[in-house]
Amino acid sequence: MADKDMKWKTLSQKYLIEKPWLTARVDKVELPTGAIIDEYYVLEYPDWVNTIAITKDGMFVFVRQYRYAIGKTVNELCAGVTEKGEDPMAAAKRELMEETGFGGGNWQKWMTISANPSTHTNLTHCYLATDVERMDVQHLDQAEDIEVRLFSRDEVMDMLEKGEIWQSLMAAPLWKYFAKVK
């Protein structure tokens, strides 16, 4: 049996805010059933990237920074935003170098996920970089206050199990890593 077409039809779009880091719009849509949703809110973002970076001696490279929206200082994978027209892997390598000073190594696409496919237009491209090494100092933006932290495999697993990796887009590739790489 063939899958039925569940695609919605866009009847209209109205932009509410257009900023470099966030664009919000309200769409009027028609469902395959004929039902109309007059106000369906959509958030447009550039694609995001994050990297599980592991040094030659098996240490995981994390960043520690304050996250205003949740009011917490947290440990995270190195992550960032793709620039317009930028290849996601190039963006991930750039972000790792800028935020941590680490680079080089062996890179592979790990997974692609969505923060919220019902309201967000962007994807998060996750990478695994092994055998990275410190190659430079951090080159932070004016608004960034980031500490580089190195954790062992056991420490990262412990943070995951305790719910201390707050960002779900970072927890997912880490859980995949621990499920696949013994």
List each language-model region with its residue ranges:
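Extreme N-terminal tail/first-helix region
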Residues: M1-K19
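Nudix hydrolase/Nudix homology domain
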Residues: A2-W8, A35, T73, K84, ...
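Conserved Nudix-box catalytic region and its N-terminal flanking loop in Nudix hydrolases
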Residues: D3-K7, Y40-Y45, N50-R94, L140-Q142
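Hydrophobic residues on conserved beta-strands that form the core of alpha/beta folds
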Residues: T10, A24-V26, I37-E39, V63, ...
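Acidic, metal-coordinating catalytic segment for phosphate/diphosphate chemistry
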Residues: K14-N50, K56
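Active-site-adjacent beta-strand/loop module that shapes the phosphate/pyrophosphate-binding cleft
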Residues: R25-T33, N116-M135
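Short, well-ordered beta-strand micro-motif
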Residues: V26-E30, A53, L128-T130, L150-S152, ...
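A contiguous pocket-lining binding segment that forms or flanks enzyme active sites
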Residues: E86-L128
